[in-house]
Amino acid sequence: MPRYVPLLLLLLLLRCSERGGGVNFGEKDAKVPGTWRDGVRVPGEGASWDSDRASPERRYGIVGLSQSISTKHPETSPKDSRIRENDVTADGRTTEDHITADPGTTEDSVTADPGTTEDNVTVDPGTTEGSVTADPATTKDYVSADPGTTKDSVTADPGTTENFVTADPGTTKDSITADPRTTEDSVTADPGTTKHSITVDPGTTEDSVTADPGTTKHSITADPGTTEDSVTADPGTTEDETTKHGDTHLL
């Protein structure tokens, strides 16, 4: 249905109410509000749509409404010179088949509410679409280590170097400090002692050998506190055999 049809009906009802009458919209007895005779409209006079008769009746109609009569009555025949079918002489203020829309309204046009854009979404303040703002002091996908700790790094205990073992106090890794009066690789030979035998005081250095009579070359007599790689051999003991005395340990 065209958009102007409801408006046309509304105007028709308003005109009818102003003149104190109405228009009959029946199928068989519908009345036309006015009759045109020789191009001049006769107010309040209409014709019946009945096919058998066309008696004029007093009706109040709308100025400018066209008349279309199809009847067999000779007086209202389209050939009658006094009645012109579909001939409308409009008043100066009325245009045939023309509808003036209400002021401020455009046909088929929608005015959006002020401040609103069609199909547009305004993001809440402080929020970026498709974006996440991390909490303060936090970096995305990043972990801050505890104070004093480096990422993927291990801080050794005080006095300890990473991947390094510090020996007990007084002991150096793979190193032996000889006591005073003892020189490394010095040899004091007892009677009957094989060459390269070493007599050591307590705290004997590495690779020092004290040979007893009859001891095989490179045998070691370790006093308490003897360092690593020392061997204490009894008389008749072969090389690489260890006899423990007291708290002596073979390292």
From Swiss-Prot:
Residues annotated as glycosylated: N120
Intracellular or extracellular location(s): Secreted
Signal peptide: 1-22
InterPro entries given in the database record: EZH_Inhibitor
Compositionally biased spans, kind Basic and acidic residues: 72-87, 241-251
Source species, domain of life: Eukaryota
Tissues expressed in: Detected in the brain, lung, spleen, thymus and prostate.
Record keywords: Glycoprotein, Repeat, Secreted, Signal
Positions of the UniProt region annotated as 15 X 11 AA approximate repeats: 153-251
Main location: secreted
Region (Disordered): 36-55, 65-251
Feature: compositional bias, Polar residues: 150-164
Keyword Iron attributed: no
GO annotation, cellular component aspect: extracellular region
Name of this chain's protein: Protein PBMUCL2
Organism (species): Homo sapiens
Originating gene: HCG22
